[in-house]
């Protein structure tokens, strides 16, 4: 069995990769994937602490985070489809809501 530190290090690495992806990338789909990676890193942390402490609250909270992530993905993809139909691009630099 792996120690808690291993899970926390993996979670920190995943969260850092996701943060760098959000800050560096310009494609909206890649940004949404990086946000999902960050949410999964948080879920991994919740599960690791839940297992370490012997408490089920962290595992229950993961279901709430997954529900919010699914709703965020659905709304985000719908907005990207609408934006692509309007502008034929999904670059975040092309998004300017004042010019619609």
UniProtKB/Swiss-Prot annotation:
Q: Which reaction does it catalyse?
A: a quinone + NADH + 5 H(+)(in) = a quinol + NAD(+) + 4 H(+)(out)
**From the UniProt record, which GO molecular function terms apply?**
NADH:ubiquinone reductase (non-electrogenic) activity; quinone binding
Q: What is this protein called?
A: NADH-quinone oxidoreductase subunit K 2
An example GO biological process term is:
ATP synthesis coupled electron transport
Where is it chiefly localized?
membrane
Q: Which Pfam families match?
A: Oxidored_q2
Q: What does this protein do?
A: NDH-1 shuttles electrons from NADH, via FMN and iron-sulfur (Fe-S) centers, to quinones in the respiratory chain. The immediate electron acceptor for the enzyme in this species is believed to be ubiquinone. Couples the redox reaction to proton translocation (for every two electrons transferred, four hydrogen ions are translocated across the cytoplasmic membrane), and thus conserves the redox energy in a proton gradient.
For this UniProt record, the keywords arranged alphabetically read as follows: Cell inner membrane, Cell membrane, Membrane, NAD, Quinone, Translocase, Transmembrane, Transmembrane helix, Transport, Ubiquinone
The protein's assembly and partners: NDH-1 is composed of 14 different subunits. Subunits NuoA, H, J, K, L, M, N constitute the membrane sector of the complex.
**Protein family:** Belongs to the complex I subunit 4L family.
Can you tell which superkingdom this protein's organism belongs to?
Bacteria
What InterPro entries does the record point to? NADH_UbQ_OxRdtase_chain4L/K, NUOK/Mnh_C1-like
Localization annotation: Cell inner membrane
User: What is the topology of this protein in the membrane according to its UniProt annotation?
Assistant: Multi-pass membrane protein
Known EC number: 7.1.1.-
Specify the species: Geotalea uraniireducens (strain Rf4)
Say if the entry is tagged with keyword Protein biosynthesis. no
Q: Which HAMAP family match?
A: NDH1_NuoK
**Which Gene Ontology CC terms are recorded?**
NADH dehydrogenase complex; plasma membrane
């Amino acid at each position: 069995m792996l120690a808690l530190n291993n899970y926390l290090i993996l979670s920190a690495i995943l969260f850092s990769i996701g943060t760098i992806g959000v800050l560096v990338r310009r494609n909206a789909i890649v940004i949404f994937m990086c946000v999902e990676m960050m949410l999964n890193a948080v879920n991994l942390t919740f599960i690791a602490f839940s297992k370490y402490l012997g408490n089920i609250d962290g595992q229950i909270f993961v279901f709430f985070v997954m529900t919010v992530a699914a709703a965020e993905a659905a709304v985000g993809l719908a907005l990207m489809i609408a934006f692509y139909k309007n502008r034929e691009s999904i670059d975040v630099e092309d998004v300017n809501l004042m010019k619609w």
